[in-house]
A protein has these predicted regions:
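Conserved acetyl-CoA-binding loop-helix of GNAT-fold acetyltransferases
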Residues: 98-114, 138-142, 146
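Conserved GNAT acetyl-CoA-binding A-motif
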Residues: 113-135
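Conserved GNAT-fold acetyl-CoA-binding loop/helix
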Residues: 21-48
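Short aromatic/hydrophobic contact patches that present stacked aromatics
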Residues: 8, 87-91, 122-124
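A short beta-loop-alpha structural element at the N-terminal edge
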Residues: 8-20
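Acetyl-CoA-dependent GNAT
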Residues: 38-95, 106-107, 112, 116
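Conserved catalytic-core motifs of GNAT/GCN5-like acyltransferases
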Residues: 72-75, 124-126, 132-133, 141, ...
Length: 159
């Protein structure tokens, strides 16, 4: 990626599954943040994208035609009163983190949600109990705090 290039953000399609799964896989295999133990198949991942797109935006960020991140939302709760609240998910390729791209992707997702009348974005994130370790860091917590999220609750010592 060159200094002059700007990322593009577009709506994902199920055809993006292989590229987005390549971004997601290291998070499943090398961290504790996804709460998944097994990497989904490309077919399953494509199905997840399609299911999300039935109701919500699923965005992909590209640099020079290469997917470098994605963001989507899912229902926070199945009850009707929660229809205006969503859970956000955002993933970036490890080689582009900490460069402001997460903010751009998050802001694009937020604008889509505002246009839909969705007023409450929540992030359920895993954080280490004390110090960072090889599987879990405070990066997501710090990012979300920087984006204006605030801690409203914690599940302590649960799996």
């Amino acid at each position: 990626m060159t200094e002059m290039s700007e990322p593009t953000i577009r709506l994902a399609t199920p055809d993006d599954a292989p590229a987005l799964l390549a971004i997601y896989e290291p998070y499943v295999l090398e961290t504790a943040i996804t709460c998944e133990y097994k990497v989904p198949s490309v077919e399953e991942f494509a199905g997840r994208i399609a299911k999300t797109l039935e109701r919500y935006p699923y965005l992909v960020m590209e640099f020079d035609g290469r997917a470098v991140g994605y963001a989507y939302v899912s229902p926070l709760n199945s009850r009707e009163a929660y229809d205006w609240s969503v859970e956000t998910s955002i993933y970036l390729s490890r080689d582009v983190r900490h460069g402001g791209l997460g903010r751009k992707l998050h802001d694009a997702l937020k604008q889509c949600l505002i246009a839909m009348g969705i007023t409450n974005m929540c992030a359920l994130i895993a954080v280490p109990h004390d110090e960072d370790d090889e599987y879990l860091t405070h990066n997501s917590q710090d990012f979300h705090a920087h984006m204006g999220y605030r801690l409203v609750g914690a599940f302590d010592r649960c799996a």
